[in-house]
Amino acid sequence: MTEYFEVGKILSPHGLKGEVKVNATTDFPEERLATGSRLFIKNNKQYEELIVENTRRHKQFYLVKFEKIDDIDQAEKICSKELYVAETDQQELPEGSYYFKDILNCPVYDAETGEKLGVLENIETPGANDIWEIKPEKGKSFWIPNIESVVKKVDLANKRIEVTLLEGLRDEN
């Protein structure tokens, strides 16, 4: 059974010829929304294929024209729907890169002491660097930046993340 992963959301029609405004939630919007790309929307628990005919950047959004969506009425029918990519259409990532789904819920350890700090519970992408929320077994969650001086090793095969905490990143109280 194919798995699907969210890569954006269709917000509203744009113009009269079937174009829609898309908020991309992927790290690879140019790749995911490229001409000829295969995306999916969910209709009544079924995934329906959409093929990208054309894409252009517009402010912080993308204006996307899908094949067979040729007027505003058809465009309105797909608005407010999430866009998905099939797992089989995901590309291999370069060394040192990973999909969020592969690292979420991984145990996080102190690289120096080996102490388990918690699990990676959430990832936010506010700007230049992602930030990761670490949930310890007891106590409050804390956030760390995904930068080289903090995240030392991500071992996908063994589901293990090693970090060096900078002073002040973790509230011990």
UniProtKB/Swiss-Prot annotation:
Its main location: cytoplasm. The keyword Lyase does not apply. One of its GO terms (biological process) is rRNA processing. It holds the Pfam family RimM. InterPro entries: PRC_barrel-like_sf, PRC_RimM, RimM, RimM_N, RimM_N_sf, Transl_B-barrel_sf. The keyword Transmembrane helix does not apply. GO terms for cellular component: cytoplasm; ribosome. Gene3D superfamilies: PRC-barrel domain (2.30.30.240), RimM (2.40.30.60). It is found in: Cytoplasm. GO terms for molecular function: ribosome binding. Residues 95-169 form the PRC barrel domain. Keywords: Chaperone, Cytoplasm, Ribosome biogenesis, rRNA processing. The PRC barrel domain binds ribosomal protein uS19. Belongs to the RimM family. An accessory protein needed during the final step in the assembly of 30S ribosomal subunit, possibly for assembly of the head region. Essential for efficient processing of 16S rRNA. May be needed both before and after RbfA during the maturation of 16S rRNA. It has affinity for free ribosomal 30S subunits but not for 70S ribosomes. Binds ribosomal protein uS19. This is Ribosome maturation factor RimM. It comes from Lactobacillus johnsonii (strain CNCM I-12250 / La1 / NCC 533). The lineage of its organism: Bacteria, Bacillati, Bacillota, Bacilli, Lactobacillales. The gene is rimM.
